Amino acid sequence: MPQPYELWWSVVPGPSQLVEQLTAHLVRFESALIPYTTASFPWGEEFRLSAYDRVRQVHPNLTEELCDASTMGERSPGRWVLDVVGRGEVFCLPSDDPIEIAAESGLLKQRIFWVTHFTSKAQVAEWVAFAKALRKKAADHCCCVVLLLPTSLRINSHLPELETDAFFGEYDLSFFASFLLSHRKLSQFEKKYLSELASALSFGDAVQCAELASVGKELLEEPEQLPMLRAIPNHLHGIWLAQIRTVFSHIEETKFAIVQQHRNAIAALLHTTDDFGIAIEQMEDIELRHLIHAVNHNIISLPERTCTVINALYNSRNQLAHHRILP
């Protein structure tokens, strides 16, 4: 049995929906991961104070005021609480140097998932900087930074800054993808693939999902060879494979949605040249671009000459007459 993982997250008021979702995923992946159920998380005052005494032994300068401040307010890297799921401890990190305190108290010795909510883009930027600093500090350990962003705060430009083991996304898929990426035995190819897949799923990039689908299927051809499966007990392999296939199923649904979205135009393309010209001339630029991607990435299958005409139209659309027959 491998060393049980530990989940860390910044405290939210009460057992929120996010906590319940994360717990459900953890319980499904590995029963040894956490001994609690969603109904028995120790959120009470008695638990918090007893944990405070334990933390003070590690860092004597920790004040009760800082611990009390953890009951909420701003959840920035300077004032926060870490719940150690499975050990029943709470670490309250003071605002001067939370990374240093985390290192001194041994918090970086296990795989760590940092999960939080955001209310502004400024908070996102602050956590990006903090995550980068943490990664540098914990270079010899296996840390995984997970930032869960609401749709309104998704910022693509931050993704590369956090390297391949960080992920912005929806609650369910983000945790799954990040959990996979935390495995140190993954090859660089697999890490890069899973990171890109997570990004595509998160930001609704249907085209990128389609591009990654074929790569993902190759990973599943010989699942027993996957490092991520060798790192966990045999009896859990089926669960992991089911979850991976669920992600790929999501990609297939995305591809199907593209076809459905443009089904009328696609049907028109398969008729006479005149009808074909009328149909594509009436398509918006973005629709035509989606259609081209769908063809080029084998999402749909069209005759070769039809594909040639589609690309020619897209490249020289402004110079075409309404019924002009393309070479």
Where are these regions (language model features)?
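Amphipathic alpha-helical interface elements
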Residues: 21-30, 38, 52-53, 95-112, ...
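Extended, compositionally biased accessory segments flanking or bridging domains
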Residues: 1-107
